[in-house]
Amino acid sequence: MVKTNINKGYVNQIIGPVLDIEFPSGTLPPIYSALKIETEDGIGTVVEVQQLLGDNKVRAVSMRSTDGLKRGVEARDLGGPISVPVGISTLGRIFNVIGEPVDEQGDVSYDETLPIHREAPAFTELETKPSIFETGIKVVDLLAPYRRGGKIGLFGGAGVGKTVLIMELINNIAKAHGGVSVFGGVGERTREGNDLYEEMKESGVINENNFKESKVALVYGQMNEPPGARMRVGLTALTMAEYFRDVNKQDVLLFIDNIFRFTQAGSEVSALLGRMPSAVGYQPTLATEMGALQERITSTTQGSITSIQAVYVPADDLTDPAPATTFAHLDATTVLSRNLAAKGIYPAVDPLDSTSTMLQPGIVSGEHYEIAETVKETLQRYKELQDIIAILGIDELSEEDRLTVARARKVERFLSQPFFVAEIFTGSPGKYVSLEETIKGFTMVLKGELDELPEQAFYLVGNIDEAIAKAETLK
C-alpha cells in the first residue's frame, strides 16, 4: 500500500458492505482511492471509493466484512488505488484482493507494488500481427488454436477436466515458453480453490521448498468474500500478470475462474450503490466494466498476456447479458464434452464445438487449415452415421462410410493425450506435442497410411511415432 498521511475522514454510515465516509472540506479522495479503516482486531479494513456524494462525503465499498465497524471511526486515505505486490516473490503464494498473503506461509518480501487500476496499453505498444500460442496439446493446437495475447473461453460442467487442463497449460507455458501464470479465483467455491492449490503442490506447479521456482501466483476472492472483493480480485490478478509481461518481458497465462462471477459481483455492488439496473437486473455499466478488464489483456511488443477464462452460463442461456458481453471479447472457445469424458478420452475437448478466430488461411499454414477442416468433416460424418450404426450395425454401411468411421475413431482416440500433471492418474508419462508433429500425425491417419493399425494404438499417445510403436506392442 502507498503509505502517506494525506487525508483523514470519519465513517458516517454503514449499510452492509457499503460505507459513507465524511472528509474535511477540500480533502475528498478521488474515485477508486483506497481508504484504510483501523479495526479492533488490528487487521484493518480497506475500502474503495466508488461515488462522490456531495456534502464532503464519499461512498465506498469494503474489501472485507464490515462486522464490528462503528460510526465515527477514522478512515485514512492511502493516497492512491489499492496497490498489490508484484514480481517473482508472488510465485507459489496465494493472495487476497488487497495483496495480502492468505496461505499461512509467512510474509512476502517484495520490492514493488502496483495499483490495480491502470490504463490499457496504448495502441502504439500493441503487437498487431496475430500469432499462434502453441500449447503442446494436440486437439487445441490443431482445431481451436489460441492466439498469443488472446482471450479464450473455457466451457465445461463439473468433473469434465477443467482443472487438469488448466494445470497442464500452466506446466507447458513454463517449460516450453519460459513463461509464468497467474490464477485469479473469482467468486468460486473455497473448496475448489483449496483443491486446486493442493493439486498444484502435488503436480510440482508450486514448489513448496523454493517458492521462486513455482510456475504460478494465485489470487483468490471466493464466494464467501463481500462483493467488493469479488469485483476487484480479477484486477489484482491482472496487475500481477502485467508486471511479468511489461517488466520481466515474459509470456504470461492469466486464468480467471470464473468471469461470470466478476459480472455478478459488479451487479451486486451496483445495486448496493443504488444505481438503476439494466437488462435482467445487471448493472448499467456492464459493458464498460468488462471492457476495462479485457482491454488490459493483450500482446505488446514486450510480451503477452494470454487469458483463459472459465465461463459459467446461467441457466444455459447464451443470450444472458453476462455471457453475451464476454463472448464479444473472446478469440477462441474450448468446450469440454461430458460424452468424451465418459468415453475416457482426455482432454475431453469437443472437436466440433470448440472454435477459434485463428483457424483461417493467412494466419495458420495452408496445410494446417486443410487438415483441421478434414478432421472436422470426418468427425461430423461419423456423428451423423452413429444413429444408423446404433440401429442397423456397422456392417450395413457402405464401404466408403465404414472407412470414414474407422478413421474417425482413430482420429477421436488420437486427439487424446497423456498430460504431465495427470501422470499419477494415467500411469503414462506426459507428452508435449509440437504443432508440426500434430499436423503430420493427423495427415497420415486421414490419408489412410495407418489404416491397418488397431484403433487402441492411438489412445493416450503423444505423436504418431508413439502410436506406431504402441501398435507393435499390441500385436
UniProtKB/Swiss-Prot annotation:
Subcellular location: Plastid, Chloroplast thylakoid membrane
Enzyme type, top EC level: translocase
Gene3D superfamilies attached to this UniProt entry: 2.40.10.170, Bovine Mitochondrial F1-atpase, Atp Synthase Beta Chain, Chain D, domain 3 (1.10.1140.10), P-loop containing nucleotide triphosphate hydrolases (3.40.50.300)
Binding site for ATP: G156, G157, A158, G159, V160, G161, K162, T163
GO molecular function: ATP binding; ATP hydrolysis activity; proton-transporting ATP synthase activity, rotational mechanism
Subunit structure: F-type ATPases have 2 components, CF(1) - the catalytic core - and CF(0) - the membrane proton channel. CF(1) has five subunits: alpha(3), beta(3), gamma(1), delta(1), epsilon(1). CF(0) has four main subunits: a(1), b(1), b'(1) and c(9-12).
Protein known as: ATP synthase subunit beta, chloroplastic
Species annotation: Trieres chinensis
